[in-house]
């Protein structure tokens, strides 16, 4: 009788330990990686964009990265209520299911491509982080501060609508052509983004040398673009790490 009771108690202890261990194992399962949507202009169509996209794919997996770049575009061109912007100088799209590249070939202009809308992309890919590389094409336009602020307010609202996500804004790199107006564009972007959405100041990592960096004072060749991407990727990694840690904490408290 005593042996039977002892055996039963021992069996209960073993079963209880198994259940507890199984529960702890389920709780300690890592959360899914972040999902990233990146959009950009001509600077992302070329080498810089490829370097950032490939880094993200390596870091969190190709299935978690959606990348779009439209030459000549500015934030307003990505907004739902604005006229569709057809780029005629280059387009790049790389997602888990698509791979599109349009650029000049043997001096021939690429076919026009419609720039997608950020609201549609967010609905489709459901990102937890949105990376934006835009603002370059504002530097050669005579737009008022109020106009740019209004566009940025709508853009920020669209990027955050329908979910809790962070936005990382990659500011324009050093430009020998528009260096005088860059401070203004940066100031407006920084003032418009909410706390918690970092602006990466690319000027800290770049210096445009005509004939070496590129030929027009704005665009970066493949080598210079890759060099610019390295410190930008390091900055993005910090945000990704914080996002993963925060979601791991939430998962462990469930």
Label the model's feature ranges.
Residues 33-38, 43-145:
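Conserved SGNH/GDSL esterase-like catalytic core that processes O-acyl groups on lipids
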Residues 1-39, 43-67, 123-126, 232, ...:
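N-terminal secretory targeting modules
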Residues 61, 173-254:
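Catalytic His-Asp segment of secreted/periplasmic serine-dependent ester chemistry enzymes
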Residues 67-69, 171, 201:
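Residue-level recognition of beta-strand->loop/alpha-helix junctions
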Residues 45-46, 141-142, 149, 176-179, ...:
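Loop/helix-junction capping segments adjacent to catalytic residues or to phosphate/diphosphate-binding pockets
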Residues 140-152, 215-220:
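Active-site cleft segment of glycoside hydrolase catalytic domains centered on the general acid/base Glu
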Residues 49, 53, 115, 119, ...:
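Extracytoplasmic/secreted envelope proteins and their assembly/folding machinery
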Residues 131-140, 153-186:
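Active-site segments of SGNH/GDSL-like serine hydrolases
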């Amino acid at each position: 009788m005593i042996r039977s009771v002892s055996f039963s108690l021992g069996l209960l202890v073993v079963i209880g330990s198994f259940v507890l261990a199984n529960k702890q194992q389920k709780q300690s399962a890592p959360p899914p990686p972040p999902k990233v949507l990146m959009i950009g202009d001509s600077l992302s169509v070329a080498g810089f964009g490829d370097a950032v996209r490939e880094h993200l794919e390596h870091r969190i997996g190709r299935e978690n990265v959606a990348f779009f770049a439209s030459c000549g575009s500015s934030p307003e061109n990505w907004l739902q209520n604005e006229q569709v912007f057809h780029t005629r100088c280059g387009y790049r799209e790389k997602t888990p299911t698509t791979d599109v590249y349009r650029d000049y070939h043997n001096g021939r202009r690429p076919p026009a491509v419609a720039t997608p809308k950020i609201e549609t992309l967010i609905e489709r890919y459901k990102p937890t982080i949105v990376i934006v590389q835009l603002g370059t094409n504002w530097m050669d336009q005579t737009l008022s501060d109020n106009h740019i602020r209004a566009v940025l307010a709508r853009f920020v609202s669209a990027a955050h609508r329908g979910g809790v996500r962070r936005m990382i804004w990659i500011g324009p790199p050093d430009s020998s052509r528009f260096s005088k107006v860059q401070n203004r564009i940066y100031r407006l972007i920084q003032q418009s983004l909410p706390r918690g959405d970092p602006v990466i100041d690319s000027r800290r990592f770049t210096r445009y040398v005509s004939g070496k960096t590129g030929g027009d004072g704005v665009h970066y060749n493949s080598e210079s673009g890759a060099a610019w991407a390295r410190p930008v990727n390091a900055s993005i990694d910090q945000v990704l790490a914080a996002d993963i840690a925060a979601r791991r904490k939430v998962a462990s408290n469930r």
